[in-house]
Curated annotation (Swiss-Prot):
Domain of life: Eukaryota
Top EC group: translocase
Matching CDD domains: DEXDc_SecA, SF2_C_secA
Compartments where located: Plastid, Chloroplast stroma; Plastid, Chloroplast thylakoid membrane
Function: Has a central role in coupling the hydrolysis of ATP to the transfer of proteins across the thylakoid membrane.
Membrane topology according to the record: Peripheral membrane protein
Catalytic activity entry: ATP + H2O + cellular proteinSide 1 = ADP + phosphate + cellular proteinSide 2
Source species of the chain: Antithamnion sp. (Red alga)
Name of encoding gene: secA
Gene Ontology cellular component terms for the protein in this record: chloroplast stroma; chloroplast thylakoid membrane
EC number per UniProt: 7.4.2.8
Chief location: plastid
One of the protein's GO biological processes: protein targeting
Family the UniProt entry places it in: Belongs to the SecA family.
The name this protein goes by in its record: Protein translocase subunit SecA
Length: 878
């Protein structure tokens, strides 16, 4: 019986699962062609009825059969339940190793039958490519086309991939393509369809961890760069506590009175807060760069550039820059070339991006701790899926040491002990710097290790390292969750091992390319390879490393063998694979007797969920495993929340420095501290959402109007509509005036704006009724526009339509960019309203609305002015 929190629904899920499984005997008798034909039948059925629930059992059973034929895997009932939950627009919480990749395919196939496109969103390109490759093999049996969005693709290729039934892509590529589509000048440049259904893998990482970071497309702004250098000099002359304080909880700097005066003296200015030249933002950013943003933790220096490191995943974020001058401050600190500060051209948060979908769901192993936020903001319920086998992971109590030095020594000694007995160990660190510190200590202890952090030189080996982290005598150091999404299999992954060994061996004996001389191939495998060396390898002609790698990949992926050479290599691969399967199985049994994979955490994160992600690397498919955190009172979390008190307590008890504290009370205190931080960041994200919702509504209004104009082939009506609206708006002001001279000025402004070159008889116009003036101006507008259209058509047919669209899109884009900047300034300053007993959010909404109305008015008037009054330079030769 499934152990469900949602026990009242279990019978409903079991009933559907039984229906799906009952169809196995039907579909396993179908030929490949008959199975493929089922897709069109289901499409016809779903289009006719629009009832997805009725065909769900059939669709899942068909996909289940395709998975079995392509991979040989039989889906567990819990995977079917996970897919049902995804189809209901909920989040399926499934533990590591439970087969989330295949679960997503079931739901994706069902929803692809609507012919509207399904997006499967992953956190990085490696996972997107890996999953898309597997999906192509499976859906080849069902006549479903799989797309993959690659960072290097041009727009036409992207358009083709988005038009597929199911498209795999990263969250950042999805967001940037959305923004680029809403900046396109030609409708042919649009790559995306309307958003229909998305399944987000590691949904908590995207919707929670990255919620505070908006996606931004930016362009250069004209700012001076010397201020950053000057501010960096000032920051280095200021001292903590005497001139400023660090707010570690909020990651902020508080400049005190002494620091303000000292800064003003150094800069030789009277006011650090002068509105005309506010130095304060440069000084605060320089101090943040000095004290809060740490090299090899928050960023790395790569090719003379500052590259951000994601605080949650440890991944480097190429192309991303901190805004508001912070990135420039860090460039000044690191003595790198300071790049021009950018202005925002388009932006959107992941919160609002994914709310654009008609239907949304996701998967993760850790969502329960953020359940309230996911439901409140995204209307997504979290359903915990039971594991297929009983979870045998043992989470040991935290060990807390007095200093960081002692903690790292203890971690290294623990790794040494595990290496001595052969137990595979995964150590999670919070920064690149700390991962390299541990690596250095292990090197001194002569303990071999694999280093998995997001430094560029280590990225290429990420999947190889994490895949083999479950082998005997393997110590793996991983920065945060680098390698997340790749299973750690006890005893090793025989497919990867066989491919690697075969590729290295062939490269070596044929002297084709450089090979990894440090990679150790087992004696049994080397014997097999050497025994078939002469007969099957040397006689092959024109083998190169690409052929070898591709041939082996084709076998792993069950692709067709196309030539005799590949066929020979495939036979060798199968022999090596079978031997590795035997070796890995035997090794797994030995590791289980040692206690399974051992996961060591070296610092508690601000979120319990991130800790759980690290722990979750152990306990795959019922494997015996354990985890433990090694902490110190100098860790950030403990330093902020009572580390000094615990240190005094240890001092009073005369506890030896090398002796750790192991206490359930301390564990509860740490969990309590994490809950406080989680609550704080939840409030931050909630506030961000509330404020961004205002801008999002305006963004949608602008983007809908822009797309309507972009796709339109006839924009004359829009121009006239803008002109008539402008006339009406200006006549409102005209009718409110009592002064004749002011009324005359307004009429003159209208006529000038619309290029209505007629003689104004003040007495006649001023004595007209409101509706008569409006009718008269509307009539003159159309006459003048007809004349201008006729003139431009004589110059070149279709020219007027091109000009209309160009002016419309150009002015919408320019006005929107300026509007974003004004909204950003408004958001920064609005907090001060709370001191005047005003609700900042209400004030923000009111002022943002006024700014939006002003922007719309500006767009209309500028487009009309350019269309009616611009002069064209005619090229006589063309």
């Amino acid at each position: 019986m499934f152990n469900f929190l949602f026990s009242n629904k279990i019978n409903q899920y079991q009933r559907i699962v039984k229906q799906i499984n009952s169809l196995d005997s039907t579909y396993n008798k179908y030929s490949d062609q008959e199975l493929k034909q089922q897709t069109n039948k289901l499409k016809d059925q779903i289009i006719a009825t629009q009832d997805i629930d009725t065909i769900l059992p059939k669709a899942f059973a068909i996909t289940k059969e395709a998975i079995k034929r392509a991979t040989g895997l039989l889906l567990f009932d819990v995977q079917l339940i996970g897919a049902i939950i995804l189809n209901q627009g909920k989040i399926a919480e499934m533990k590591t190793g439970e087969g989330k990749t295949l679960v997503a395919m079931l739901t994706a196939y069902l929803n692809s039958l609507f012919n509207k496109g399904v997006h499967i969103v992953t956190v990085n390109e490696y996972l997107a490519k890996r999953d898309a490759t597997l999906a192509k093999q499976i859906f080849e049996y069902l006549n479903i086309h799989i797309g993959i969005i690659d960072q290097s693709m041009h727009s036409q290729e992207r358009k083709k991939q988005y038009s597929c039934d199911i498209t795999y892509l990263t969250n950042s590529e999805l967001g940037f393509d959305y923004l680029r589509d809403n900046m396109a000048i030609q409708k042919e440049d649009l790559v995306q369809r309307d958003f229909f259904f998305a399944i987000i893998d590691e949904i908590d990482s995207i919707l929670i961890d990255e919620a505070r970071t908006p996606l931004i497309i930016s362009g250069p702004a004209n700012n001076k760069l010397t201020e950053y250098l000057e501010a960096n000099k000032v920051a280095n002359l200021l001292n903590q506590n005497t001139d400023y304080e660090i707010d570690e909880k909020n990651k902020n700097i508080i400049l005190n009175e002494n620091g303000i005066k000292k800064s003003e003296n150094i800069l030789d200015i009277n006011n650090l807060y002068d509105i005309q030249k506010p130095w304060i933002k440069y000084i605060l950013n320089a101090l943040k760069a000095k004290e809060i943003f740490i090299k090899n933790k928050d960023y790395i220096v790569k090719n003379n550039e500052i590259v951000i490191v994601d605080e949650f995943t440890g991944r480097i974020m190429e192309g991303r820059r901190w805004s508001d001058g912070l990135h420039q401050a860090i460039e000044a600190k690191e003595k790198q070339k300071i790049q021009q500060e950018n202005k925002t051209l388009a932006s959107i948060t992941y919160q609002n991006l994914f709310l654009l979908y008609e239907k949304l769901s996701g998967m993760t192993g850790t969502a329960k701790t953020e359940e309230a936020e996911l439901e409140q903001i995204y209307k997504l319920k979290v359903v915990e899926i039971p594991t297929n086998k009983l979870n045998q992971r043992k989470d040991l109590s935290d060990l807390v040491y007095k200093t960081e030095y002692v903690k790292w020594k203890a971690v290294a000694n623990e790794c040494f002990d595990m290496y001595q007995i052969g137990r595979p160990t995964l150590v999670g660190t919070t920064s690149i710097e700390k991962s390299e510190l541990l690596a250095k200590i292990l090197k001194e202890l002569q303990v071999p290790y694999n280093l998995l952090n997001r430094k560029p030189e280590n990225i290429t080996r990420e999947s190889e390292i994490i895949t083999q982290a479950g082998r005997k005598y393997t110590i793996t150091i991983s920065t945060n969750m680098a390698g997340r999404g790749t299973d750690i299999i006890l005893g090793g992954n025989p497919q990867i091992l066989a491919k690697t060994a075969l590729t290295i061996h062939i490269n070596k004996i044929l002297n084709l390319t450089q090979y990894n001389t440090n990679y150790k191939i087992e004696n049994e495998i080397t014997y097999i390879l050497n025994s078939i060396n002469n007969t099957l390898l040397i006689n092959n002609i024109d083998i190169n490393s690409q052929d070898i790698s591709q041939s082996i990949n084709n076998i792993i992926n069950n692709n067709m063998i196309q030539d005799a050479k590949s066929y020979k290599i495939s036979n060798i691969y199968k022999i090596v694979l079978n031997k590795y399967k035997q070796l890995c199985h035997n090794e797994k049994q030995e590791i289980i007797t040692l206690g399974g994979l051992y996961v060591i955490g070296t610092e508690r994160h601000e979120s319990r969920r991130i800790d759980n992600q690290l722990r979750g690397r152990s306990g795959r498919q019922g494997d015996l495993r354990s985890s433990r955190f090694f902490l110190s009172l100098q860790d950030n979390l403990l330093k902020i929340f009572g580390g000094d008190k615990i240190s005094d307590f240890m001092q009073n008890l005369n506890i030896d420095e090398d002796m750790p504290i192991e206490s359930s009370i301390l564990n509860k205190s740490l969990s309590s501290a994490q809950k406080k931080i989680e609550a704080y960041f939840y409030d931050v994200r909630k506030q961000l959402f509330e404020y961004d919702e205002v801008l999002n509504n305006q963004r949608q209004a602008i983007y809908i109007e822009r797309k309507r104009l972009l796709k339109s082939n006839y924009t004359r009506d829009c121009i006239l509509e803008y002109a008539e609206s402008t006339i009406e708006e200006m006549l409102v002001t005209y009718n409110q005036q009592t002064d004749i001279s002011e009324k005359t000025k307004i009429l003159s402004k209208i006529l000038k704006l619309l290029n209505l070159n007629i003689y104004i008889n003040n007495n006649i116009l001023l004595n007209m009724e409101e509706n008569d003036i409006k009718s008269f101006l509307f009539e003159q507008l159309r006459i003048t526009y007809d004349l201008r259209e006729s003139y431009l058509e004589q110059l070149r047919p279709g020219l007027i339509r091109q000009l209309e669209k160009y002016y419309l899109l150009q002015q919408i884009d320019y006005a929107w960019q300026e509007h974003i900047n004004k909204i950003s300034i408004l958001k920064e300053s609005i907090g001060w309203r709370s001191y005047g007993q005003q609700d900042p959010l209400i004030e923000y909404k009111n002022e943002a609305f006024n700014l939006f109305i002003n922007m719309v008015t500006y767009i209309r008037q500028t487009v009309i002015y350019l269309t009616m009054r611009s002069r064209l330079i005619v090229n006589i030769d063309n």
